[in-house]
Amino acid sequence: MPLLQVEDLTKTFKGHASLFGRNQFNAVDKVSFTLERKQTLAIIGNNGSGKSTLVKMIAGIIPPTSGRILFNDRELQYQDAQSRAKHIRMVFQDANSAFNPRLNIGQILDEPLSLATDWTETQRNEKIFETLSLVGLYPDYTNLNIKHLSISQKQRVALARALILEPEIIIIDDAIGNLDASVRIQLLNLTLDLQQRLGISYIYVGQDLGVIKHIADTIIVMDEGKMIEYGSPQNLFTDPQTDVTRRLVESYFGKILDETAWVKDKNAH
């Protein structure tokens, strides 16, 4: 039984009104896939392809128009946000706008614990310190205001906030790809380490195919709301079956990859 099962997930938006009524378009159109435990699924595609809309439905931020999302074989209801938040958390793309700038880090991390648990303040503080340590931050960071942190530190806090309820799935919405190379490598290694230690499954949305080649077990390619390809990085990057995938690979790597690109990775490890 897969950890997450998405069946025919669809999101329809209403467009501008016209003489013939209000136009509708499917931002996501009957997308289906599964995610296994301790696996990473990447979602790629051009801007406007439906990637972010898809993961927002999975995270419970927006309701689907139709289709089902099953976690451990139990259907998730959009209205049951509190239950979903314990299992599926999201790290957003822009760390600068992801937090209330008036809060310190302790308050930011305490909020999900206060909402989702009946723990005492002492228990919550212990969990906050433990989670900060997991992402490489010291306990005394709890008293720092979020606005005084670097972008790398903010992303670590965002990851800590996602981790603190011990979810099985974390969605990362392009939160690594836009960072400087050295910071990106640090956070990439951190997420992989946490996956090994805690058994987390990731859904990674992004444009950095170099990162995706390194971390993903499977990839979904989106175009105009539809899933047009699904497979391993090696299959998709060496033998793309659609023009969209081919252009994405060639745009990033400068060419379609061959098998030697993975031999180099194995030797590096």
UniProtKB/Swiss-Prot annotation:
ABC transporter domain boundaries: 4-249
UniProt-listed Pfam families: ABC_tran (PF00005)
UniProt topology in membrane: Peripheral membrane protein
List of residues binding ATP: 45-52
Keywords: ATP-binding, Cell inner membrane, Cell membrane, Membrane, Nucleotide-binding, Peptide transport, Protein transport, Transport
Subcellular location: Cell inner membrane
Top-rank taxon: Bacteria
GO CC terms, sorted: plasma membrane
Main location: membrane
One of the GO biological process terms: peptide transport
GO molecular function, one term: ATP hydrolysis activity
Purpose: Involved in a peptide intake transport system that plays a role in the resistance to antimicrobial peptides.
Family: Belongs to the ABC transporter superfamily.
Protein name, as recorded: Peptide transport system ATP-binding protein SapF
Source organism: Haemophilus influenzae (strain ATCC 51907 / DSM 11121 / KW20 / Rd)
Source organism phylogeny: Bacteria, Pseudomonadati, Pseudomonadota, Gammaproteobacteria, Pasteurellales
Gene name of the encoded protein: sapF
